[in-house]
Amino acid sequence: MRSIQRRLSVGLFAVLLVVGLVLAQTGLWLFDQGLRRYFAGNLREEAENLLVAMVRGPNGMQLDEQRLNPAFQRPYSGRYFVIELEKDTWRSRSLWDSELEVPHKKGLVQGLVDGPEEQRLLVFRGHYKRMGQKLRIVVAQDYTPILESFARVQWMGLGAGALALLLVLLLQRLTVRRSLRPLEEVRLQIAQLQQGQRSQLDNQAPEELEPLVEQINHLLAHTEETLKRSRNALGNLGHALKTPLAVLVSLAEREEMARQPELQQVLREQLEQIQQRLGRELGKARLVGEALPGAHFDCAEELPSLCDTLRLIHGPHLQVSWSAPPGLRLPWDREDLLEMLGNLLDNACKWADSEVRLTVAQGEGMVRLKVDDDGPGILPDQRQAVLERGTRLDEQVSGHGLGLGIARDIAEACGGRLSLEDSPLGGLRVSVELPLQKSGRAARA
C-alpha cells in the first residue's frame, strides 16, 4: 500500500471503528447497570409492599390479595413473586403453573434468570421478619423489553455510527487531498523542470516541504555548476592539446621527415589516431543526455541559425532546409542536440550535391530526427563500418571521420539509437530515434 491517503483512511477507519464500538458498548453497559439499579429499588419497594400485605388471619399469617399489584394477578404479566415462610409458601397468580427460581443470596441477583414464556427476569430476594416470623420474599420483573430496546438502540447506533464514519472518512479524504495539494504543485514544478520551463522550484512552500524544496534547488544548482566546470575543463583540455598536436603534425610534414617515408607515415597515422580518439572521448565525456532545467532544445529557435551557418560554410549552391511541428521543444540537453545535429548536417552537406533536409517528428512516444541528402549514399554492407570510430570511406573528404560516431554516442546517451537508411532524395538518410519515456514528453511552446 503506497498511497498516503489510503494509509491514512485505513488507519483512521480502524481507529474510529474500534473506539466507536468500545464507546458504544461501554455506554450501553453503563446504561444497563443504571437501569438495573433503578429496577432493584422498585423491586425492593414491591417486596416491602408484599411484606405489608402479610396480615394475621384465623390460621396464622395470610396474604391480603386486596393489597397486591394487579400485575401479580395476570398470568405471565412479567411481575412475579414468591413468599416463603417456615411452613407456607405463596406464589403470585401471574406465575400460573411455572416455577420461579429462588436465588440463594439476598439482594439483587447478578445477571438475569430464566422465567416463563422465555422471559428474562431481574430478581430480588429480601429477608424480613413480621409478627415474629421470618419471611423470604422473592420479587421478579421481566427485563426482556429492556433487552429488546437495547438491541434496537444498538442497531440504530451501528447505523448512525456507520454513516458518521463514512462522513468522517469523506471529510478526512478531502482534508488529506487538500493537505497534499502542495506535493502535487511540487510534482508539476518538477515536470516543468524536465520540460525546461523553469530553472528551480518555488521557495514558497509549506513548512514541512521547505527542506525538500531547498535540497532539490541546491542539487540543481550544484549539478549545473558541476556540468559547467566539467565542460570548461574539457574545453580547456582540448585547447591545451591542440598546440602540441599541431606542432607534431607540422614536424611530421617537414622535409627532414620526407626522407624517411616509412617513419613519416607511421607518425601521421598515430597522430591521426590521437586526434580521432581525443575528439571522440572528449565528445563522449561532455554528454549530458537529459537536459538540465531551462536547457532544452527549442527547434524553432535553434534550427534556423544552424542551417544558416551550414549554408555559409558549404556555399550558397547547397539548399539546407528543416521542418518540425510548431513550437516543439525537445527534452534533451541543448548542447548535446546541437552537436549531434551539427555533425549530422555537416556530414550530409559534405556529401550532398544540392540538397540537405532535416525532418523532426514526434509520435508513439518517440522523437524522430531524419537527415537526408542527395549525395552518392552508402552501400548497405558498408554502413556499419562508417559508424565505427574514425572510419571514412573517402579520404578526399575533409575531417577525421568522427561525426557519425559522436552523433551515435549522443543518441545512445539520450536512450535512443542511430541508423543509416536510403534517402528519398537519392542519397543517405541518417535516422535518430529518441524515446520520450526516459525524459518526459516533448513540450510545446
Curated annotation (Swiss-Prot):
PTM annotation (Phosphohistidine): residues: 239
Keywords on record: ATP-binding, Kinase, Membrane, Nucleotide-binding, Phosphoprotein, Signal, Transferase, Transmembrane, Transmembrane helix, Two-component regulatory system
Subcellular location: Membrane
An example Gene Ontology biological process: phosphorelay signal transduction system
Domain Histidine kinase: 236-438
GO function terms (MF aspect): ATP binding; phosphorelay sensor kinase activity
Catalytic activity: ATP + protein L-histidine = ADP + protein N-phospho-L-histidine
Main location: membrane
EC number: 2.7.13.3
GO cellular component terms given for this protein: plasma membrane
Topology in the lipid bilayer: Single-pass membrane protein
Domain HAMP: 177-228
Enzyme class: transferase
Database matches in InterPro entries: HAMP_dom, HATPase_C_sf, His_kinase_dom, HisK_dim/P_sf, Sig_transdc_His_kin-like_C, TCS_sensor_his_kinase
Transmembrane segments: 150-170
Signal peptide extent: 1-24
Function: Member of the two-component regulatory system CarS/CarR that regulates the expression of multiple genes involved in calcium signaling and homeostasis including CarO and CarP. May function as a membrane-associated protein kinase that phosphorylates CarR in response to environmental signals leading to activation of specific gene promoters.
Name this polypeptide is given: Sensor protein kinase CarS
